[in-house]
Regions:
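Metal-dependent amide/peptide-bond hydrolase catalytic core
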Residues: 233-403
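Midchain, well-structured core segments that form catalytic/ion-binding scaffolds
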Residues: 112, 120, 126-139, 170-297, ...
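N-terminal capping segment at the start of a domain
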Residues: 2-28, 130, 316, 376-377
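Short, conserved micro-motifs enriched in small and acidic residues
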Residues: 28, 134-146, 226-234, 381-388
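Active-site metal-coordination/substrate-binding segment of hydrolases
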Residues: 67-162, 167, 187
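Short glycine-aspartate micro-motif
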Residues: 72-76, 188-192, 212, 365-367
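A non-catalytic alpha/beta surface segment that caps or lines the substrate-entry region
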Residues: 22-70, 74-76, 80
């Protein structure tokens, strides 16, 4: 079965994770895909494939004769998607021999524009898959799942060492590795397939933290509010304006970190803001935290102690701190790309993958592309050729590790 056929089947199973849930997984619907993947793995000969109580799918492919001593290589993708634009199953548009121009997304009024996504011109002549403008596509990360499954199918008859496969829940809400069992997985090195263009070999992620800021106002009748009222919503706005506006994500790129306001609620009586803080440099992230703490201190001095409370929690670290000690893993991936006629691309991840956390748990795990682009919204798209090339690259990675 072709990777694209699998992909279309998987995106028909909705799996949005839920950041407001404390369950594991956060959404029961993730089990729907997990059970299907276990059945498919078993049908492909992965007899020990199973899904555990926390919705992690594991499977192992024994080495071919004579390759028993080669390192076990793991392949990982995540089953959940973001919850935005996920109220219905995707209705993908298939555009054969794409002309490199703007693409109207169904009747939604949205247009996939080359000016917004300049790489589109490089996809001319390929089979382009887009949304109809009303949902996500689900390429993040069901294209990765489809590619891994196709690799498993095509491994038959090819010399290879031990191969471990895992599909995780809740990656999109930062919990993809919470209950991941590296002992069950059993790999020495691994790769997540969770990137964009084919040929990506990524080993740098953000350092990350999250901040929640709560504000307590003093709500009195506005007719007698002079020198008494403290409007929590306005204090929240004041706090946000005290932060460096140049560090908002819409103004940053490459190695530039950001402070991103993700949620806000408020009234005169109380208000709440939520932020994510990101930077590839640990010291720069610390400076962003310090800027928030200083703003909080000044507002409490201005409006009275206890007017606002700031809680910052670290989330994950830059996996480059670990992967710098395993250059051979990235070099194998780059060599595989070149062998498959693709120039390897190593750009910093402006986010993270499950591999960022797993690397700090003793499982070096860089990230590979999937052939998809513009994740998390209705402009998501990918190409059949990109997916097929990623299957070829991963097979070559496994072949090289088996030498």
């Amino acid at each position: 079965m072709k990777g694209m056929e699998r992909f279309f089947r998987y995106i028909g199973i909705l799996t949005p994770s839920d950041e407001n849930s404390q369950n594991h997984p956060s959404s029961a619907c993730e089990f729907n895909l997990a059970h299907e993947l276990v059945k498919e793995l078993q049908a492909l000969g992965v007899s020990d494939a199973f899904v555990d109580e926390n919705c992690y799918v594991y499977g192992h492919i024994p080495p071919t004769p004579g390759k028993e001593e080669r390192p076990a290589i793991g392949l990982i993708a995540h089953m959940d998607t973001v919850s935005d634009f996920c109220d219905a199953a995707p209705n993908p548009q298939i555009i054969e021999n794409y002309d490199g121009r703007d693409v109207p997304l169904g009747t939604s009024g949205r247009v996939l524009r080359v000016t917004d996504f300049p790489h589109l011109s490089q996809l001319k002549g390929r089979t382009l898959i887009t949304t109809d403008g009303t949902t996500i596509l689900g390429s993040d990360d069901k294209s990765g799942i489809a590619e891994i499954m196709t690799v498993v199918e095509q491994l038959d008859g090819m010399p290879h060492g031990p191969v471990s496969v895992a599909f995780t829940p809740d990656e999109e809400i930062g919990r993809g590795t919470d209950d991941f069992r590296t002992d069950v997985f059993g790999a020495k090195y691994a790769f997540t397939l969770d990137g964009e263009a084919e040929g990506e070999v990524q080993y740098e992620s953000f350092n990350a933290a999250g901040a929640e800021v709560s504000f307590r106002g003093n709500n009195v009748h506005p007719g007698s509010a002079k020198n008494v009222m403290v409007n929590a919503a306005l204090v929240a706005m004041e706090f946000n304006e005290m932060l460096n506006s140049a560090q908002r994500p819409e103004y940053t790129e490459n190695y530039q970190g950001f402070v991103h306001l993700t949620d806000m609620t408020g009234s005169v009586a109380d208000a709440r803001l939520k932020y994510i803080l990101r930077d590839h440099d640990r010291n720069m992230l610390a400076a962003k935290k310090a800027g928030m703490e200083l703003a909080a201190q000044r507002l409490n001095e201005k409006y009275g102690a206890g007017t606002m409370e700031l809680v910052i929690q670290d989330q994950y670290q830059n996996m480059a701190e670990i992967l710098k000690d395993y250059p051979e893993v990235m070099e194998v991936a780059r060599k595989a790309c070149r062998s498959c006629g693709v120039s390897p691309i190593s750009v910093p991840i402006r986010g993270a993958t499950d591999g960022a956390i797993l690397s700090f748990r003793g499982l070096p795990c860089p990230n590979l592309g999937t052939g998809g682009y513009a994740f998390h919204g209705p402009y998501e798209h990918l190409t059949v050729e990109g997916m097929d090339k990623m299957v070829e690259i991963v097979l070559e990675i496994l072949r090289i590790f088996a030498e």
